[in-house]
Amino acid sequence: MPLLHLQREKQTYGYFSPERFVNSQGTRTDEIAMNPAYFAVCPPEEIMQTLCHEMCHLWQHHFGKPGRRGYHNKEWADFMEAIGLMPSSTGAPGGARTGDKMADYAIEGGRFLEAYESLMTDDYRISWMDRFPSREKLMAAIANGTTDEMAGDLSIMGLAGISVEDGEITFEPGERPNKSNREKYTCPLCQRTFGASLA
């Protein structure tokens, strides 16, 4: 049984890491990490696709023959197709089925969409999101319309930098949260700027 982990790894929706964790008895378990920074800016279908993509890596690690680290081989691609996800280097039809950096898309009438549609009802949804999503990802999601179906949820959740009015999502520029452990100060006498630790 893998450990499901939320991790803000830059430029990745998720990843699989075999035998990443160990308990006090020495038992090892695998890790599937999901990036919560994308939860507010990606449709739920895409988030579930990422989880299934990583679960295919988990399956291959235990029951198949994984390629070299990071490589998505034919066996993995065949298993993805079997569960209803088409591997694609571009994330769209026509992309390569194997390679180092791979995306995927749902196959119409496939097992993934069937399971997704039965799971994602009014009673079930991804109900927690990062309140401070990446500005770049947020603006791109608003521009290409991927957040449209989530307008109601985004409005209720009060995400920083997002305004929703009559179903219309807009980006509000504002101050970014201070992610460092330092605060910037300016000397009133000499006007020099310096940093001081917040701790």
Set out the residue ranges of the language-model regions.
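Active-site recognition of the HExxH zinc-binding catalytic motif
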Residues: 49-62
